[in-house]
Amino acid sequence: MNAILSDQKTFQAIIRVNQAIEDIRQGKMVVMVDDEDRENEGDLVYAASFSTPQKVNFMASHAKGLICVAISKKIANRLQLEPMVKKNDSSYETAFTITVDARTAATGISAGERDMTIKILADGGSHESELVRPGHIFPLIAKEGGALVRIGHTEGSVDLCRLAGQGDSAVICEIMKEDGTMARRPDLDIFCAKHELNIVYISDIVEYRMMNESLIRVIAESTTQFLGKDARRYDFVDHNDNHHIAYAFGNIKNRSAVKFHSIMPDNELLADTKKYNSLIQAIHYLQKSGGVLIFMDNGTQDMSKIREYGIGAQIIKHLGIENIELLSDSKNKEFVGISGFGLSVIKSTNVNETVA
């Protein structure tokens, strides 16, 4: 029965993505929704290559949120769009760049002038000198790998435009209700019916891409010992050539415990008594219950900085785990936006509260 339900869910997801691709290809707008465990919000989305003053005005009048343009890193580099801040500590680390206007614009705020700016961002032959900074359009840089890395509207909208053959820039705007609060699932259904728009979920796009793509590959597999415990070691490389290691302890089942940890030099780990003891505690628990310790090469020693676990989710999926007991060093660990990978967090456990 679960397999049938899963197949039906996948079928519906593919239908929604195919419809959204066709809408984007025709220059229409769609509503894109993220997971309930993330922002749980909907954005109006259309391909920047199809921008018009009328579309910008519709977003400003009916969606009411911040009008942004999601772009690839390649576009940002070509137009010399630097990050808005050096240290991004926003909730979901949304990658805003410095705001921009078209150089030929007057104030830059009208629908027509914002459309001028959007067209420059979408034009593959445009030059950074055509823009002035700051301005009234907010570019956002999508992570390389798209929604398979970060399950956000920025990545989902760029993925959708690419799938539709409309380049890698999308205009997006959050949808708010008349009272100024954010529109949620029931509100978005009403919004779509009123404006005759189709809806697509970012998890749908993840599922659609996962049918034919993977950003990870196994480069080695061996039986070994880790800190004195028998384990199966898996070495992975992702699309950015980052190296990740998974140690599987005990009997790995569909439902298993998972602990994420940053890759760090042995001397640093041993020098940090708190982290070392926490790791030992986690390994005891994983061996007893059956689970996986995943060392992520994420460029930071602070795992709390990882708000999206796209690569980690693919590693978990590769190991045959779908229902996760998430081990962490605190009660506030996030593992969001993973339903498109066919995963569910069924329990969160504080490592420090487990009994070795």
Swiss-Prot record:
UniProt GO BP: riboflavin biosynthetic process
GO CC terms of this entry: cytosol
Protein residues bound to Mg(2+) 1: 39
UniProt keyword Plastid, yes or no: no
Textual note on the cofactor: Binds 2 divalent metal cations per subunit. Magnesium or manganese.
SUPFAM superfamilies: RibA-like, YrdC/RibB
Keywords: Lyase, Magnesium, Manganese, Metal-binding, Riboflavin biosynthesis
Site (Essential for catalytic activity): 136, 174
Annotated residues for binding of Mg(2+) 2: 39, 153
Record region (DHBP synthase): 1-211
Region (GTP cyclohydrolase II-like) location: 212-356
EC number: 4.1.99.12
InterPro entries hit by this protein: DHBP_synth_RibB-like_a/b_dom (IPR017945), DHBP_synthase_RibB (IPR000422), GTP_cyclohydro_II (IPR032677), RibA-like_sf (IPR036144)
Disulfide bond entries: none
Gene Ontology molecular function terms on file: 3,4-dihydroxy-2-butanone-4-phosphate synthase activity; GTP cyclohydrolase II activity; magnesium ion binding; manganese ion binding
Membrane-spanning segments: none
Cofactor(s) for this UniProt protein: Mg(2+); Mn(2+)
Residues involved in D-ribulose 5-phosphate binding: 38-39, 43, 150-154, 174
The reaction(s) this protein catalyses: D-ribulose 5-phosphate = (2S)-2-hydroxy-3-oxobutyl phosphate + formate + H(+)
Coiled coil: none
Matching HAMAP family: RibB
General function of this protein: Catalyzes the conversion of D-ribulose 5-phosphate to formate and 3,4-dihydroxy-2-butanone 4-phosphate.
Similarity comment text for this entry: In the N-terminal section; belongs to the DHBP synthase family.
Designated name of the protein: 3,4-dihydroxy-2-butanone 4-phosphate synthase
Gene: ribB
